[in-house]
């Protein structure tokens, strides 16, 4: 899992939660350049914030990760309304703040979705149009 988040404490908390759940976090990217470097490791899943150290680059990062690397991308942001119709190739958005249980249910859904297993999206996840087609 790749975490694209510029708030260091939030990113560390996410990494700890995911590690405790048995997920391998390949890195934390606070900006587009770092995300592009870490993308070379082909993450299966990425959690991406919208507004990063280098500005509102999250949507572009998410689209690149999905389209160029085949990553399942979920936006995790306090500004979910900015993603009205979503970002092509990405799955959806969860509003911050989010608790450990919600992260767990969302990650479970993402893993199942990625491997083609049937799963219902958790209530905290707003799917983008055409996500499940």
Which role fits each region the language model picked out?
Residues 96:
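A Lys-centered signature of the CheY-like receiver
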Residues 67-74:
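His-Asp phosphorelay/catalytic-motif detector in bacterial-type signaling
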Residues 105, 113-133:
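CheY-like receiver
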Residues 5, 77:
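Conserved acidic carboxylate
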Residues 7-27:
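Two-component/phosphorelay signaling modules centered on CheY-like receiver
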Residues 99-104:
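Conserved two-component signaling phosphotransfer/partner-docking surface
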Residues 15, 28-45:
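Acidic, metal-coordinating helix/loop segments flanking the phosphotransfer/catalytic sites
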Residues 48-66:
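Conserved phosphotransfer microenvironments
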């Amino acid at each position: 899992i790749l975490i694209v988040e510029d708030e260091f404490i939030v990113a560390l908390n996410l990494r700890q939660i995911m590690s405790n759940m048995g997920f391998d976090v390949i890195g934390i990217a606070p900006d587009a350049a770092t995300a592009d470097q870490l993308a070379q490791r082909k993450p299966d899943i990425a959690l991406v914030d919208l507004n990063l150290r280098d500005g509102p680059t999250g949507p572009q990062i998410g689209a690149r990760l999905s389209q160029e690397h085949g990553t399942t991308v979920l936006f995790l942001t306090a500004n979910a309304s900015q993603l009205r119709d979503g970002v092509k190739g990405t799955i959806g958005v969860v509003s911050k703040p989010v608790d450990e249980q919600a992260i767990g249910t969302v990650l479970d859904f993402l893993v199942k979705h990625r491997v083609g297993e049937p799963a219902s999206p958790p209530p905290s996840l707003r799917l983008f149009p055409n996500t499940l087609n």
